[in-house]
């Protein structure tokens, strides 16, 4: 038996090759526990049941200590398979990163129908009380939908259908969150957090990959040997139809999973994962200074990329202090022989490529970086790239996926070369920021040239080749910044997020719904990557009955905006992450424009703290349709940034309990807006807010 210590927890490797994770304080007790024969990965072979540890099945062959973790080796002699489990132990955290590899060392092809990323048991284990008698276990799940991302809910085990009913040692009680398709976070974020509030310990499991996945919470052993487990899997025939024909001498790798146990609560698990995700990210801004973006789409010009509309916005964005100006959708041709999606040719009625360069030059003349919207994976049937060759778009059973609105096949070298050329053309005329969108899912997968493998495996192959393509863009264009947008945050799993500088948190159009989305999003992505729309002076979606209605604010509109409350609320929300400004700010009156500029200046002083902070939730999470007060804190070693919202119809004095974080010498350093009414003592912050008002407070700890 071998033990390895992490920050609060320990990993125990039993003689049969089984490993588990426990509180360091309970290491001795858990070490004495008889381990089950369930391996820390799941393998199914066509025509067989789940394989387990044992002499006639999976045999443990020992471990090797590596530079940053462990390598455990197994064999399944009946099918001549070697399995390697790589465990990376993330320093100063409780995070364990697991990846499994399986190799066929025999002479015959083996058809795999499940190959999971991670599995571990003994959650909430106690010598004195089985898990099903512990009434203090809570399971947190992050629900998601378009314009409603980041919706965390807490459940009891019985509410999820997990309760023992038998003495038999089989998994019959389980709950699963899953995704099928390339919108990997459209329904759930792939993370489950289990809190044992009795012992103050928390377990977590997360996986990654822009394709099919599931995370399963299950019980084994019934009443006799009760065990609670978590499993993460991206390869399963029962979840999207995955299978893989593993040929002789071939090796296959699972996706990574991140799991562990921390002493503490939900926020502590999030903090551990945040440390890992920051270290795992391949792109970060120097010194954590995120350049402020103005994007002309949301509640702004909505894709009507007429220079007569763009240029006044450029002027005002520069005046207010923005550092990037991004031209969003609508700049490219979508009529006649060219396609808006796939060919990336400027819309002739507005400008040609030289005209686009003139706009980029104008943006640069205002000391801002030019940015532009793309959807590099998509192509209309009229696009040249769609018919470049017979394999340029993704197909399923020889039929293009998505019909007229197809998807490029990134396994095709010609596609990668063609799109690299399109990015290069934009780069050469000055664009250094790309907002890359993704507005449809490929479903269960694709069957292009994948040697007869399942569509689900095709989805994995295409996702990985697209990741490689993104990495190649950074190598070729070193000044390039890429934003990931998947109809908001419908594709924001870590494998995509780690290679992008920022992530759109939502396409939400109503400012008062954003705090809920933002608070939940902070638990799944680094705050400095969480791109948050702020749209003071919003122009709502301009198409009524299919007809375009130009924005024309009337007296009623100006009267609604004159007190500045909506502007402040917008800016407070966006300043909790990556400030992403929009709205028709060229119409701002003097008061509102000053409030926008005050916020931008405030943000420039505090953004360096955001990039080293972790989120706290002193008033809990906020549901998207809840009308109550809410608070989000971002805490670092010597600083607490606190946003407080009143999403009710009446004035409130909000008391935010912070006794775990404040000291007697803690003091308020700055507030936004500057006339906000707030106070501080050693245990709380108090803020007076009218209906639909918000305040941002910087506190020196």
Task: State what each model feature region is.
Residues 4, 466-678, 686, 691-696:
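Active-site-proximal substrate-binding groove within the catalytic cores of carbohydrate-active enzymes
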Residues 228-237, 677-680:
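Short, structured beta-strand/loop micro-motifs enriched in basic residues and often containing a Trp
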Residues 244-263, 691-700:
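Short Pro-Gly-centered flexible turn/kink motifs
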Residues 1-223, 240, 666-680, 685:
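Polysaccharide-binding surfaces and accessory modules of carbohydrate-active proteins
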Residues 260-291:
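Terminal connector regions
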Residues 289-420, 433, 441-445, 451:
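Aromatic-lined carbohydrate-binding/catalytic grooves of carbohydrate-active enzymes
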Residues 99-102, 249, 255-257, 642-644:
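Buried hydrophobic-core signal for structured, non-transmembrane domains
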Residues 100-102, 329, 333, 363, ...:
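Active-site and adjacent substrate-binding regions of carbohydrate-active enzymes
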């Amino acid at each position: 038996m071998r033990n390895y210590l992490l920050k609060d927890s320990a990993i125990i490797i039993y003689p049969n090759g089984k490993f588990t994770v426990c509180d360091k304080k309970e290491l001795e007790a858990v070490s004495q526990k008889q381990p089950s024969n369930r391996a820390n990965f799941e393998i199914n072979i066509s025509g067989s049941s789940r394989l387990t540890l044992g002499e006639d099945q999976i045999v443990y062959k020992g471990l090797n200590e590596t530079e940053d973790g462990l390598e455990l080796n197994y064999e399944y002699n009946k099918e001549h398979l070697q399995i390697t489990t790589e465990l990376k132990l993330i320093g100063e955290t409780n995070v364990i990163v697991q990846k499994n590899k399986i190799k066929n060392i025999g002479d015959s092809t083996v058809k795999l129908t499940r190959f999971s990323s991670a599995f571990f048991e003994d959650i909430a284990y106690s010598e004195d009380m089985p898990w099903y008698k512990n009434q203090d276990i809570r399971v947190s799940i992050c629900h998601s939908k378009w314009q409603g991302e980041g919706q965390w809910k807490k459940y009891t085990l019985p509410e999820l259908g997990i309760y023992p009913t038998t003495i038999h040692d089989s998994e019959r009680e389980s709950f699963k969150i899953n995704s099928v398709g390339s919108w990997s976070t459209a329904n759930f974020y792939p993370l489950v957090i289990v809190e044992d509030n009795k012992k103050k310990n928390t377990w977590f499991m997360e996986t990654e990959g822009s394709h099919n996945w599931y995370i399963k919470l299950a019980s084994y052993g019934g009443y006799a040997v009760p065990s609670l487990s978590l499993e993460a899997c991206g390869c399963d025939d029962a979840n999207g139809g995955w299978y893989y024909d593993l040929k002789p001498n071939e090796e296959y790798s699972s996706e990574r999973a991140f799991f562990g146990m921390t002493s503490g609560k939900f926020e502590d698990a999030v903090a551990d994962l945040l440390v890992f995700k920051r270290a795992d990210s391949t792109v970060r801004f120097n010194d954590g200074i995120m350049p402020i973006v103005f994007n002309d789409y949301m509640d702004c010009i909505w894709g009507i990329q007429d220079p007569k509309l763009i240029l006044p916005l450029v002027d005002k964005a520069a005046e207010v202090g923005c550092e990037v100006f991004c031209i969003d959708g609508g700049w490219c041709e979508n009529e006649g022989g060219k396609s808006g999606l796939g060919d990336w040719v400027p819309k002739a009625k507005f400008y040609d490529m030289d005209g686009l360069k003139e706009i980029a030059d104008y943006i640069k003349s205002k000391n801002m970086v030019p940015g532009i919207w793309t959807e590099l994976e998509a192509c209309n049937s009229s696009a040249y790239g769609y018919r470049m060759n017979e394999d340029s778009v993704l197909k399923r059973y020889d039929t293009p996926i998505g019909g007229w609105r197809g998807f490029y096949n990134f396994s095709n070298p010609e596609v990668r070369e063609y799109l690299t050329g399109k990015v290069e053309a934009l780069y050469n005329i000055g664009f250094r920021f790309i907002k890359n969108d993704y507005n449809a899912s490929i479903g269960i997968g694709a069957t292009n040239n994948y040697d007869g493998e399942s569509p689900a495996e095709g989805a994995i192959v295409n996702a990985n080749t697209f990741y490689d393509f993104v990495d190649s863009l950074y190598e070729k264009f070193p000044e390039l910044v890429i934003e990931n947008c998947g109809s908001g945050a419908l594709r924001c799993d870590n494998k995509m997020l780690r290679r992008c500088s920022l992530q759109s948190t939502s396409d939400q159009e109503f400012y008062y719904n954003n705090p809920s989305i933002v608070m939940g999003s902070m638990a799944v992505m680094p705050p400095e990557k969480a791109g948050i729309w702020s749209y003071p002076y919003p122009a709502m979606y301009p198409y009524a009955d299919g007809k375009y209605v130009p924005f024309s604010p009337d007296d009623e509109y100006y009267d609604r905006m004159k007190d500045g409350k909506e502007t402040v609320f917008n800016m407070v929300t966006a300043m909790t992450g990556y400030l992403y400004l929009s709205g028709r700010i060229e119409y701002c009156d003097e008061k509102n424009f000053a409030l926008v500029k005050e916020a931008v200046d405030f943000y420039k002083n505090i953004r360096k703290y955001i990039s080293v902070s972790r989120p706290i939730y002193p008033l809990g999470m906020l549901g998207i349709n809840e009308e109550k007060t809410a608070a989000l804190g971002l805490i670092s070693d010597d600083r607490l940034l606190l946003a407080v919202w009143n999403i009710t119809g009446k004035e409130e004095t909000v008391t935010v309990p912070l006794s775990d974080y404040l000291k007697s010498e803690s003091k308020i350093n700055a507030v936004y807006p500057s006339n906000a009414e707030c106070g501080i003592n050693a245990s709380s912050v108090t803020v007076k807010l009218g209906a639909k008002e918000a305040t941002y407070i910087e506190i020196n700890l």
